């Protein structure tokens, strides 16, 4: 018989098993298995944008719990890993890391540097994901900037062009002057900022003074109208008249519109092109002229003697206010706090510019998308409202153009041929992937076309993350249609709650437009990982936890244990106490396994190979039967929780059973029988050892999705050379049940609890002998009474039924 190792070294063992799993391809996807037997995951491709943190471990391990469970349940698993390595986040990382600016160098040179940086950063991710034992199939890896991904992303674009769901137009868009690019509505965040409400004097064309209030006086040269509410009696006499703007002396119409708030400012509002969404509405509704004074770099260009040209927005605002004061045109200023729309990544206040852009039709599909949100299985269910709220709030079509460099190019040129100037030329599907700066449309020379210099929003590509893995977009656009049909729609999208409005929404939109379907059946939402004081982790606070240090201190299984203790969808604080509990659990699993191991040589070979159902009749002891029934109940409960994506509940049930039912009670109660040193009860001994054998094996399997290394190590020592994590290794005891009265075993436990408390109060050892136990309220069977005598060290037990409740008198 082999020896049980003296101790468990997590550092050595975790590395050992990670290597073995890769070598033996335990996690390999089998493309020959039927679709119905395959479970497909749309893994979040991490953004290559900076330092790895504990949040990556937190969210990705929670997905892995479900994946490992599904594999053990017999599913053929398609579990890829991708890297979202194109777009603005990566560009910002490269610019910061290399201390360069994209606009100061050749485009090709900057792209080359980006490619070098992402290759290095992605290797760090691979290393971490292997260390935390993500059971991905690395042969399925993809990058969003790879040629294949660019091809599929461009297919998505062309398919939507063909379906008339994409258009290009010169219209107002949100512009980030810091990053120099257009943004979509989902790329912005509202920030509370202090400012001034400036009360400025205008005049009517007849010279009568008018006072308007504005927070953006620098937009005076872009003023195209002044509005009042049609029901506002103060201004009804202005109908049909014009106003003269101060400083710039431009004549603009005075118009009525119900969008004006009578209680804000003076009730007179200047409309500029453009200060906000309302300006756009008025510009379109009233067919107003366009005056563009803000450049793409966020400076003023109005070519006026006020000399604010070339100034940044805030500088121009300060200067205009000074001039207005000097000319006594500024009546007063009020301190205010208002909401400003800012770029989510750069933090810069956004401007509204009119620039030709590509848009995906979104507003016209809002009702359909709300129906899709309802069709999807949400885990947890309360997260659905976040998507519904976002869909209801959408007021712009999705702008997918970005004026950047490291991204997927639009497969588009613009004709310069005589007679078709400006005609949009699309690449043929056979040309993809293409770069319009290097390639040409069929039948055109370089001199006859102008390439589209923009790249796609990174979400335009990551929104087809399922299709990047399935290698197809639709019936007409596919690299491998058979593969796509087999894998799409997928089974699961795991992701964080803060990107429901972006990644989840855009992916649902694309699948709806491409194939009139959902992209997946289930969506599993994770929360945030917070600092121990429940504040958000940030570099500025110095509270960001680095995974490498925690892995070195605790190991992967303990970190995964901490992650498994957080409820699905909930924000969870890092906890040193939970980490210590995880370490304690690993140690207890090891010691419990060591105890059961010493008895296994007493088992017959065929009984070790048989299932619990097959050897059911050989478990003869009443308490052993009760234990197996409790185990069967646990398996059913834990399985149900995992099938419903409630991994934390499954972990809690299993851990509580292990500590309380198995270690604290069963091991202690059956210990004397298991050893049977006096050979009094060979049948009872064999029954207990069989029970130990199968309960420990089952518990290892229930813990396996959460703590893969320690369970694999113990499983190999105790049971098999085959991996515990292979397909179909889960337990199914649906047909197993012993017809016994559970009251007997439960009564034994109640009596034992009373005795333990008595000994603890008397500061006695748990093994301290007892002369007599007088028990009323229950009469135990001879088997249970013998187990009770052994575990309490009682010489004699007397039972009588004179009480309704169990009472115990202890005589030392």
From Swiss-Prot:
Gene Ontology BP annotations: valyl-tRNA aminoacylation
Compartments (UniProt record): Cytoplasm
Motif ('KMSKS' region): 536-540
Reaction(s) catalysed by this chain's protein: tRNA(Val) + L-valine + ATP = L-valyl-tRNA(Val) + AMP + diphosphate
Enzyme class: ligase
GO cellular component assignments: cytosol
Listed EC numbers: 6.1.1.9
Family annotation (SUPFAM superfamilies): Anticodon-binding domain of a subclass of class I aminoacyl-tRNA synthetases (SSF47323), Nucleotidylyl transferase (SSF52374), ValRS/IleRS/LeuRS editing domain (SSF50677)
Chain positions of motif 'HIGH' region: 46-56
Residues that bind ATP: 539
MF-aspect GO terms: aminoacyl-tRNA deacylase activity; ATP binding; valine-tRNA ligase activity
Subunit structure and binding partners: Monomer.
Domain notes for this protein: ValRS has two distinct active sites: one for aminoacylation and one for editing. The misactivated threonine is translocated from the active site to the editing site.
Homology family: Belongs to the class-I aminoacyl-tRNA synthetase family. ValS type 2 subfamily.
Function: Catalyzes the attachment of valine to tRNA(Val). As ValRS can inadvertently accommodate and process structurally similar amino acids such as threonine, to avoid such errors, it has a 'posttransfer' editing activity that hydrolyzes mischarged Thr-tRNA(Val) in a tRNA-dependent manner.
PANTHER family: VALINE--TRNA LIGASE, CHLOROPLASTIC_MITOCHONDRIAL 2, VALYL-TRNA SYNTHETASES
NCBIfam families for the chain: PRK13208.1, valS
Protein name stated in the entry: Valine--tRNA ligase
Source organism: Rickettsia rickettsii (strain Sheila Smith)
Lineage: Bacteria, Pseudomonadati, Pseudomonadota, Alphaproteobacteria, Rickettsiales
